[in-house]
């Protein structure tokens, strides 16, 4: 049996590389409700310096026909770890991919980046119109 620690790529890297935004049918499509997900360990790389950027992602959405599976979203956001991408672009791209996968009634993503060089950045993007719950 091959030791998973000596395989290249490692099992975690393979899981991230093969990740898809898996969704399942909304169990309560007739009821307005919100789902809130926080991902406190998001990382990507600065496109100018290549230094790592760290952020807390906060996703709030009102499901349409599909709900995103939690492990799938974790692996999906981990795929940005080695990508050189701006705060603004990564936040918009993640929202676009989640909207395409779930077709929500409303969705908002906030990326709260750790301060770097005495500058704190928060990027907030949304899609659709929020309904009362």
Swiss-Prot record:
The keyword Membrane does not apply. It is found in: Cytoplasm. Its main location: cytoplasm. One of its GO terms (cellular component) is cytoplasm. Pathway: tRNA modification; tRNA-queuosine biosynthesis. It comes from the Bacteria. It catalyses: 7-aminomethyl-7-carbaguanine + 2 NADP(+) = 7-cyano-7-deazaguanine + 2 NADPH + 3 H(+). One of its GO terms (molecular function) is preQ1 synthase activity. GO terms for biological process: queuosine biosynthetic process; tRNA modification. Catalyzes the NADPH-dependent reduction of 7-cyano-7-deazaguanine (preQ0) to 7-aminomethyl-7-deazaguanine (preQ1). This is NADPH-dependent 7-cyano-7-deazaguanine reductase. The lineage of its organism: Bacteria, Bacillati, Cyanobacteriota, Cyanophyceae, Synechococcales. The gene is queF.
């Amino acid at each position: 049996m091959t030791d998973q620690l000596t395989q290249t790529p490692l099992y975690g890297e393979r899981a991230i590389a093969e990740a898809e935004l898996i969704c399942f049918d909304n169990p309560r499509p007739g009821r307005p409700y919100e789902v809130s997900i926080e991902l406190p360990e998001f990382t990507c790389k600065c496109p100018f310096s290549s230094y790592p950027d760290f952020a807390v992602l906060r996703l709030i959405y009102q499901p349409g026909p599909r709900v995103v599976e939690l492990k799938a979203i974790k692996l999906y956001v981990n795929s940005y770890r080695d990508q050189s991408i701006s705060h603004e672009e990564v936040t918009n791209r993640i929202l676009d991919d989640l909207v395409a996968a779930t077709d929500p009634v409303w969705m908002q993503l906030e990326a709260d980046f750790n301060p770097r060089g005495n500058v704190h950045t928060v990027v907030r993007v949304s899609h659709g119109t929020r309904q009362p719950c």
